[in-house]
Regions:
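Phosphate-binding glycine-rich loops and their immediate beta-loop-alpha structural context
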Residues: 13
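Mature extracytoplasmic enzyme cores
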Residues: 1-5
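Active-site core of glycosidic bond-cleaving carbohydrate-active enzymes
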Residues: 16-317
Length: 317
């Protein structure tokens, strides 16, 4: 899946996609202790990744972008997350200041989509939260998208010392907790009613909870965080069903976020259980790992190499 840049699937998608790169970069560094390909990937984005028709926004994949000119607004936020980890965790060779203008441009772009609560509402482009019903729950306000937005602001604030970003992130997280949290779990979205009021729906999913935990919508140690963490650690997510039908997580990105969390928490037995549950059948069928658990997309996907890093960590390497 790698020649000169990260590719999703060499037989189908010879393009460097954002978001996928977030996990493929972790795999490169985890397997080689280097970020050679990631450096080339990020340099491409610095030099030519900005869209001409949507000032401030970056391409969803570059080079070899799609002819339609469409873009995934959420991927620009994952890009900021990748930049943060490249600089702070992988100690990449590209100086962080090389990213400043582009990162600030992304946030300037999003200002036009902020509503009266500073929440992102009805974003342009191909809104992508997960390969599941969550992708049908992006309007009017996607709570997972706003969790990601708040976290990206926080990362940029830390990276570049921009206090306004940190303050906005804090306000957004509080708003999300006030509007999306029902006392146990977070909802998937809010919609405008006939009076124009923003009302949170009763639609819920596993992945929205993973977003809330990864992006620290509630801080670690907070009772709400610990309650969700305990449910996931003890494999008791069926408890969410008392709030109605719960959309299960798919591989991209729900399962990866969940596995990241289990790794961070040192829950290696649970992590091993999840890897076997979702990926062993893929390996047995095709000797590769897939983009989606139903096998309808790529059956040899680059970001799936992150599983190797998880297995190494389980084995103590």
């Amino acid at each position: 899946n790698v020649l000169d840049i990260y590719m999703d699937c060499p037989s189908r998608e010879r393009a460097g996609w954002l978001f996928d790169s977030y996990y493929t970069a972790k795999a490169e560094y985890g397997l080689t202790d280097k970020s050679v390909v990631e450096k080339a990937f990020l340099e491409n984005y610095i030099k030519g990744g900005n869209l001409k028709n949507h000032i401030g926004m970056v391409s969803m994949c570059y080079p070899a972008d799609v002819f339609s000119g469409s873009f995934v607004p959420q991927w620009s936020l994952w890009y900021i997350y990748e930049i943060y980890e490249y600089v702070t965790e992988r100690h990449g060779e590209i100086e962080k200041e090389m990213f400043r203008t582009q990162v600030c441009g992304i946030f300037d772009y999003f200002k036009d989509f902020e509503n009266e609560y500073e929440l992102l509402e009805r974003l342009d482009g191909w809104n992508f939260v997960e390969w599941s019903k969550l992708n049908d729950r992006v309007f009017d306000v996607s709570w997972p998208t706003n969790m990601l937005y708040a976290a990206a602001l926080d990362r940029a604030a830390e990276l570049f010392g921009i206090s306004d970003y940190a303050e906005k992130s804090k306000r957004l997280k509080q708003t999300i907790c006030d509007m999306a949290y029902n006392g146990v779990i977070f909802a998937d979205r809010a919609v405008r009613n006939k009076n124009g009021e923003l009302v949170t729906t009763d639609e819920v999913s596993q992945t929205a909870q993973y977003y809330a935990l990864k992006f620290k919508t509630v801080p670690e140690g907070d009772e709400r965080f610990e309650r969700l963490k305990d449910i996931i650690l003890k494999d008791r997510e069926s408890e969410f069903e008392r709030f109605g039908e719960v959309e299960p997580a798919d591989v991209l990105p729900g399962m990866y976020i969940k596995m990241e969390l289990l790794l961070k928490w040192g829950a290696y037995d649970r992590l091993k259980q999840e890897i076997k549950r979702y990926f062993l059948c893929m390996a047995r069928q095709t000797s590769t790992l897939w983009e989606r658990k139903n096998g309808k997309c790529s059956l040899d996907h680059g970001f799936a190499s992150y599983i190797c890093v998880l297995i190494k960590r389980i084995c103590g390497e």
